[in-house]
């Protein structure tokens, strides 16, 4: 869900209503009202075959090889949830926008997927644990990102992964979280961090981009450590 950065189509996807940004304030947006046109953006709806193929390939490399349980936070209309389900994973999607979730449920009808209304910072999943927590363009909107990351880490099974797709968007008043900042937030957690830069792959966005876009894949130890 894209904030107004002053550059149409350059905004990120965030959950239905974020809090204050990690590095900059997230604008307030009525995501229920935006849901009908949300998938019109190439990297939101993944309607273009080349864009869809690009995201599918990246997601396959980020998620665990074996099919498992994936928690998609700020899932929006469920485009990444659908790719994960098609790759054999059982998906739980969480978003604050009922209108977005209505579209996600329709998109994943017949797949092993459930969608819940809730806050990405405190997902309403009880004591469940997952093999991967997938979050695209959401962390930057949340206050206390270090605390949020620790909570997401606590929801992983041993050997699980945090897959965080983030960036910095706009030139006049940039919003987002730089890769170096996110890597620093993950540094205190026991695990392995890999940063993958995405700005130079126009297939992901349906066009060339010149801002900072990246994915961080954080892998937890195979044996659980103390929170």
Write out the residue ranges for each language-model feature:
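Conserved beta-strand signature within the Rossmann-like core of class I S-adenosyl-L-methionine
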Residues: 160-167
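A short glycine-rich, Lys/Arg-flanked "PGG" loop and its adjoining helix->strand segment in the class I
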Residues: 146-158
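A short acidic, Gly/Pro-enriched loop at the edge of an enzyme's catalytic core
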Residues: 121-132
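A short SAM/SAH-binding and catalytic strip from SAM-dependent methyltransferases
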Residues: 132-145
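Class I SAM-dependent methyltransferase SAM/SAH-binding core
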Residues: 71, 77-122
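Short alpha-helix
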Residues: 175-190
